[in-house]
Amino acid sequence: GKSTLVNLIPRFYDVASGCIEIDDLPIESYTLQSLRSNISLVTQEVTLFNDTIENNIIYGGHTSDEIQVAIRDSHIDEFIDDLPKGLQTRVGDQGILLSGGQRQRIAIARAMLKDAPILILDEATSSLDSESEKLIQKAFDRLMENRTTFVIAHRLSTIENADRILVLSDGEIVEEGTHDELMSQEGDYALLHKMQFND
């Protein structure tokens, strides 16, 4: 349901019916390269190469100043100083030598460097402990500034400040609005929020 919906945006799947538009143009009118170059994707499962932290952050062509800003804003600087070789520390296959929170921060730094106008966060905090989630939420807040962001989250703290929240159930949109609007409707969103925050 939810992941399938956002996977339609970068055209991992084609729309069977209806139309998805970006800037009033159907997404099919863009080349895949053009479309995907304008989308950053951060998922629960981060793909890392058996290489250094630095090489896992960059995919080429970035200045050291840009890299340093991404490192600071994604809170990577809070753990790289403790590693034996800092940015040059190797992460192992799929980042096995790093915690889940550290891997997520590398994915966030990548998205910051890409600086795409569309951001998709697909359950990006679901497997993290609450301390890592707090750090990553700060990084997400920075990353989401001035861009269209699609967030799939069961942890509602991730989306409380969203301009528009859609609640899906059985593949259908059942509620839509801001956090305050949805709380006042006392529907599925409000119930889930009350369960998570005991309010």
Where are the predicted features?
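ATP-binding/catalytic-site motifs of ATP-hydrolyzing domains
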Residues: C19-E21, L25, E172
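ABC-family ATPase nucleotide-binding domain "signature/switch" substructure
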Residues: T4-F12, R36-E45, D51-I58, T63, ...
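ABC-family P-loop ATPase nucleotide-binding domain
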Residues: F197-D199
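Conserved glycine(s) of the Walker
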Residues: G1
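Conserved H-loop
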Residues: D77-P84
